[in-house]
């Protein structure tokens, strides 16, 4: 029997579902600070600010996880568009993403992917299709020791999530896809809320490895209604959570 506390929390979470959400407003790439795309400022500024982040429409979620918008959010629906700038980072370097205020009710995982840009293509002109199997996971945080990555851990880290680029990763241009999946309404599908932000980087160094096989996925394609962790009732008694997507590629 579900406790009164969990039932009350579920009601509150549903009420909050249409209220404030979040996005990455700043990030540090290999020691250099960048401002992310600011959806309530950048579209109304002339000249338009130059960013490394692909445009997002606002702080709201993508709930149709089988559409192109799940890739990098949708600037105006139908997917996002490339950004004009590219950040440079050495393999083995760190990227720290700072999120705007995140609701405590929006529990869930924090996941980061990289997408390899074809060598003959400029990332500032590249928009992956939904059939491009280029994305691989380099970091994830879910539910551990009673704490959720998207709320408890992120809050304890001053709204900042830091990932490391695998030191063996081959040089080239990549798209970084950093995402929170909020599960407060995910009892059934559709219900899970994806908040993806995408950034353009150039990786340098002497690495010579890239993942293959089951490490690679497409967006859309990586998540479906039956993917473990997409439909998940956080108001029941549970001890673990299956993070959606492929296994993390560590560079081996």
Swiss-Prot record:
Practical uses of the protein: Lignocellulose is the most abundant polymeric composite on Earth and is a recalcitrant but promising renewable substrate for industrial biotechnology applications. Together with cellobiose dehydrogenases (CDHs) an enzymatic system capable of oxidative cellulose cleavage is formed, which increases the efficiency of cellulases and put LPMOs at focus of biofuel research.
Keyword Cytoplasm applies: no
Cysteine disulfide partners in this protein: 72-198
Molecular function as annotated in GO: metal ion binding; monooxygenase activity
Binding site for Cu(2+): 21, 106, 195
Secretion signal span: 1-20
Entry's EC annotation: 1.14.99.56
InterPro entries cross-referenced by the UniProt entry: AA9, AA9_LPMO
GO terms classed as biological process: cellulose catabolic process
Protein name in UniProt: AA9 family lytic polysaccharide monooxygenase B
Organism: Gloeophyllum trabeum (strain ATCC 11539 / FP-39264 / Madison 617)
Localisation: Secreted
């Amino acid at each position: 029997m579900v406790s009164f506390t969990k039932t009350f929390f579920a009601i509150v979470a549903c009420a909050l579902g249409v209220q404030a959400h979040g996005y990455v407003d700043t990030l540090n790439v290999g020691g250099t600070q960048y401002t992310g795309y600011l959806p309530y400022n950048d579209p109304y500024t002339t000249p338009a600010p130059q960013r490394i982040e692909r445009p997002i429409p606002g702080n709201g979620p993508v709930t149709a996880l089988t559409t192109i918008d799940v890739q990098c959010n949708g600037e105006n629906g139908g997917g996002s568009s490339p950004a004009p700038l590219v950040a440079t980072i050495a393999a083995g370097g760190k990227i720290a993403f700072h999120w705007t205020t995140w609701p405590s009710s929006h529990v869930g995982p924090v996941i980061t992917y990289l997408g390899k840009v074809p060598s003959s293509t400029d990332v500032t002109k590249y928009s992956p299709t939904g059939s491009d199997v280029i994305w691989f996971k380099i970091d994830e945080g879910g539910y551990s020791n009673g704490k959720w990555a998207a709320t408890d851990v992120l809050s304890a880290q001053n709204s900042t999530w830091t990932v490391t680029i695998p030191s063996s990763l081959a040089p080239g241009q990549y798209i970084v896809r950093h995402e929170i999946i909020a599960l407060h309404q995910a009892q059934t599908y559709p219900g899970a809320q994806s908040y993806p932000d995408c950034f353009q980087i150039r990786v340098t160094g002497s690495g010579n490895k890239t993942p293959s096989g089951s490490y690679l996925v497409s967006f859309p394609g990586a998540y479906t209604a039956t993917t473990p962790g997409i439909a998940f009732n956080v108001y029941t008694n549970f001890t673990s959570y299956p993070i959606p997507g492929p296994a993390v590629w560590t560079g081996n």
